[in-house]
Amino acid sequence: MVRGLMKFPGISTKLLNISVNSLCKFRNLERAETLLIDGIRLGVLPDVITYNTLIKGYTRFIGIDEAYAVTRRMREAGIEPDVTTYNSLISGAAKNLMLNRVLQLFDEMLHSGLSPDMWSYNTLMSCYFKLGRHGEAFKILHEDIHLAGLVPGIDTYNILLDALCKSGHTDNAIELFKHLKSRVKPELMTYNILINGLCKSRRVGSVDWMMRELKKSGYTPNAVTYTTMLKMYFKTKRIEKGLQLFLKMKKEGYTFDGFANCAVVSALIKTGRAEEAYECMHELVRSGTRSQDIVSYNTLLNLYFKDGNLDAVDDLLEEIEMKGLKPDDYTHTIIVNGLLNIGNTGGAEKHLACIGEMGMQPSVVTCNCLIDGLCKAGHVDRAMRLFASMEVRDEFTYTSVVHNLCKDGRLVCASKLLLSCYNKGMKIPSSARRAVLSGIRETVSYQAARKTHIKIKAAIECNTLMYP
């Protein structure tokens, strides 16, 4: 790109802007900066669009401070930031919920003699809503926007409808929608926002009504619309209706996100349609539309392990590596659990060791899975060594170890571990306490169990006083 620029000394600022914009879109800010310097050396001076493009790139991919630093360079070049400049900065700050920074930029814009536009106010209003400060958000809508002589558009109302739905006021959102229809034309996004709110409230009848409204307005549901409904059908156990919608989407060429596909596969398995589940996952992974989604591979990996198809597991893991996908915590947990289920405890331990060798920290869930599997296979000592090596443990870690120590007859060790949990203020399920006391009562004596119970009760009461 830079060499190409050097070859054409007659290039314009417009071409420079196109090149900078292209590099920024691909997150190559360093090359964009180099291109800008080369352009200046050739006498191609940047304009406000050039700097605004850089600022937008920095706010999206680097940080607000780095983006703001560009405004100083603008002024040094004799170019004053405009409303677009501040909108990019405000958007970057609002995205990270940096309200004070947003307000500071608003003040700076006003002091510079610039008037915020609807984008500016929409971004500020959205930030207030996301922070739960609805009063200030409504003040912008009812006062600030009108004082500025601006008229709210559908973008503004989309923000308001989304906030109402997310805060549980779906009925208010529907009433506002009915009121707005005579004033502004709803967008497809408007309907998707309301359908999402109704789906999360599990109001199936209202969702059907909103779909009819959407079609009456001349819109065609898109992948977002259908995927939202698909998730609701499966969450509300309307499996057949969900599968019908899935087949309709598939027929019409829609693509799905990882969650939707996993939900479909899970529903197919629950209804005894394992072959269709395999076919669905194979199509998803091989089609290329979701080939970069590790969630999809995780689902297929889990299916292969459950079916005992280890050759397919090996092939799939090789494919994941070839495609450059990065296994997540769930991938590693599936592998460890799958190896444990076929009795390969050594392989499960080796896989956990490999995670550490790759410079990653195994998740607590993966470690918990291995500890429980080792104990169930009778390798309690190996499980305890892993337990001792863990830097982070949760209540499930302790609960699993206590239960398994009791099953192995190591009641003294189990009771000491349980007491240490209560002394630290941890909330351990009562089932662990019952397992310890029952074991001591049956194998030692009722009196010993009574003494342990008194110690546990004292530890719980002590921590209740310290952390009420």
UniProtKB/Swiss-Prot annotation:
PPR repeats, residue ranges: 12-46, 47-81, 82-116, 117-152, 153-183, 187-221, 222-256, 257-291, 293-327, 328-362, 363-393, 394-428
Spans traversing the lipid bilayer: none
This protein's UniProt keywords: Repeat
Pfam families: PPR, PPR_1, PPR_2
InterPro entries tied to this protein: Pentatricopeptide_rpt (IPR002885), PPR/CCM1_RNA-binding (IPR051222), TPR-like_helical_dom_sf (IPR011990)
Family: Belongs to the PPR family. P subfamily.
PANTHER family linked: PENTATRICOPEPTIDE REPEAT DOMAIN CONTAINING PROTEIN-RELATED (PTHR47942:SF16), TETRATRICOPEPTIDE REPEAT (TPR)-LIKE SUPERFAMILY PROTEIN-RELATED (PTHR47942)
NCBIfam families: PPR
Protein's name in the database: Pentatricopeptide repeat-containing protein At5g46680
